[in-house]
Swiss-Prot record:
It is found in: Host endoplasmic reticulum membrane. It comes from Lolium latent virus (isolate Lolium/USA/US1/-) (LoLV). The lineage of its organism: Viruses, Riboviria, Orthornavirae, Kitrinoviricota, Alsuviricetes. The chain crosses the membrane at residues 17-37, 77-97. This is Movement protein TGB2. The gene is ORF3. TGBp1, TGBp2 and TGBp3 seem to act together for cell-to-cell propagation. TGBp1 is the main movement protein that physically cross the plasmodesma with the viral genome. TGBp2 and TGBp3 would facilitate TGBp1 function. Belongs to the Tymovirales TGBp2 protein family. Keywords: Host endoplasmic reticulum, Host membrane, Membrane, Transmembrane, Transmembrane helix. Residues 38-76 are lumenal. InterPro entries: Plant_vir_prot (IPR001896).
Length: 120
């Protein structure tokens, strides 16, 4: 047996961690991109053979299906929810724009603007 001395290598930290972080960021970005491109958020319609995720109709001898595409409003009143929210907000703010005498009379809480209250 002859003993040959093999060189010993020691691991040393990299001079800069910039390359490590850049590689991790690139891998994360690629993984996130693949995940987002493969995710299907459309509703499942149809059966195990016929899928209509973008809307359409199918009919054969025993069954028929009709599905409107997502994103198409079925109602002509698409502004009705927005108008309802604005009306509710307006009704909630009406008491704040009335004179103080009306507000004092209908307010029952201790923080009302009452001139006879000792904190005012």
């Amino acid at each position: 047996m002859s003993s040959t001395s093999e060189p010993t290598y020691q691991l040393a930290p990299p001079d800069s961690l910039k390359q490590v972080y850049l590689t991790l960021a690139a891998g994360f970005a690629v993984g996130l991109g693949i995940f987002l491109l493969r995710t299907n958020t459309l509703p499942h319609t149809g059966d195990n053979i016929h899928h209509l995720p973008h809307g359409g109709c199918y009919r054969d001898g025993t069954k028929s299906i009709r599905y409107n595409s997502p994103g198409v409003a079925t109602s002509s009143n698409i502004f009705l929810p927005a108008v309802a929210v604005l009306c509710i907000l307006a009704l909630l703010h009406v008491p704040f724009f009335q004179p103080d005498r009306v507000r004092r009379r209908c307010c029952r809480f201790y923080w009302c603007a009452d001139p006879h209250h000792p904190t005012v």
